[in-house]
Design a protein with these regions (language model features):
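N-terminal pre-domain/capping segments
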Residues: 2-130, 226, 233, 238, ...
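Acidic/histidine-rich catalytic cores of soluble enzymes
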Residues: 72, 164-279
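Short amphipathic alpha-helical segments and helix-helix/interface helices
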Residues: 62, 92, 120, 161, ...
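Active-site acidic/histidine proton-transfer and metal-coordination neighborhood
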Residues: 14, 21-25, 66, 94-203
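A short, acidic, amphipathic alpha-helical segment used as a generic capping/interface helix at domain edges
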Residues: 283-294
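Substrate-binding cleft of secreted/luminal carbohydrate-active enzymes
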Residues: 294-311
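Short, small-residue-enriched loops and turns at beta-alpha junctions
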Residues: 49, 80-84, 109-112, 138-140, ...
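Flexible, glycine- and charge-enriched loops at secondary-structure boundaries
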Residues: 51, 55-58, 88, 143-150, ...
């Protein structure tokens, strides 16, 4: 898929720089364990451990997560490997037993007629505040969609968001597939979605590994304040820029020479273009700058979404991250 064009990046990066300068001038200081928010984990990478074991499998995963400092998880609604977790009250009990909260889940079947009341009931029983979706699921062909499809999909989700909000759940969408596509005229779909989605009815969850496709998260967080209430964290080889490289530079931390230390460790990685998965903090992303901007973006929750061994390293880094 084509990346962010140079013109698109330059037209939007100025707003991000100005917003960050304003925050610095205002004396904003953020503490370690970024923004004072609990360190979270998405359950999807750990689904195989739950499987047919259901609540017992969930308990085993949560025990391990708590032991490394994870206090918040994002669940998956009952389906696939999570199909045994149909009783929201029982899920809540297992969570409470381990001192872990679940403010959101990725819900499947939100658009299916008749499904919404059951999904809302399940989320409410667990004590969730957000109903999330992996993708809005608009039609794309070879990575391309149409403006009409964007408008119709946004209209549908604005209506769903009004229903869920009345039931105590804020609708939110992650970005995969449809959200990471382009329009036939070459524009990125993501900013157009932000134009047509009601900012009060549908919030956003930014997938960090997508930054090389749809652009710098700092740019989005500062240009659309209050709209990004959640994020999935992965290590990203941001130093490679976007595709094509001429599109501009992403939020990259200073070079090893400027830091007076060693490099970030592994090359490539999850969301970074191949190789071993990169842990958060072992990559080239300037996470201090990302979390500074995320406060403007309205971040309430973030979840490491990586395999267990990489999650352990990412959590260790987040525990020490002092955002100032």
């Amino acid at each position: 898929m084509a990346g962010l064009s140079r013109r698109e990046f330059l037209n939007t990066a100025g707003g991000a720089t100005a917003a960050l300068a304003f925050m610095a001038a205002s004396g904003v200081r953020l503490s370690a364990a970024p923004l004072g928010l609990p360190i979270g984990s998405q359950m999807w990478p750990h689904r195989a451990r739950i499987g047919t074991d259901g609540y017992a499998g969930l308990a085993a995963v949560l025990k391990d997560m708590k032991s490394i400092g994870i206090d918040s998880v994002e669940m998956i609604s009952p389906s696939g490997e999570f199909k045994a977790l149909t009783d929201g009250k029982q899920v809540r009990k297992v969570l409470d037993d381990h001192g872990i909260k679940s403010p959101s889940a990725h819900f499947r079947g939100v658009r299916t007629p008749g499904n919404l009341p059951t999904l809302i009931e399940w989320g409410n029983a667990i004590g969730m505040t957000h109903m999330n979706m992996a993708s809005m699921g608009g039609q794309i062909v070879n990575g391309v969609t149409t403006l009409d499809m964007v408008k119709r999909t946004c209209d549908e989700y604005n209506k769903i968001g009004a229903i869920t909000k009345k039931s105590g759940l804020q609708l939110m969408t992650h970005n995969e597939g449809f959200e990471n596509s382009r329009l036939a005229d070459g524009r990125l779909t993501y900013p157009v979605l932000l134009e047509y989605l009601d900012p009060d009815l549908v919030k956003m969850q930014f997938q960090m590994s997508s930054m090389r496709t749809i652009g710098d998260p700092v740019m989005y967080f500062t240009m659309y304040p209050g709209r990004f209430e959640s994020a999935h964290l992965q290590g990203v080889d941001a130093a490679a820029g976007v595709n094509p490289p001429a599109a501009g530079q992403l939020t990259v931390k200073p070079s090893p020479e400027a830091q007076g230390g060693r490099g970030a460790g592994r090359a490539g990685g999850q969301g970074g273009g191949g190789g071993q998965a990169l842990a958060v903090g072992e990559d080239s992303v300037d996470w201090v700058k990302v979390f500074q901007a995320a406060k403007t973006g309205g971040l309430k929750h973030y979840f490491v979404e990586q395999s267990w061994d990489v999650t352990v390293r990412s959590v260790a880094f987040l525990k020490t991250l002092n955002v100032t």
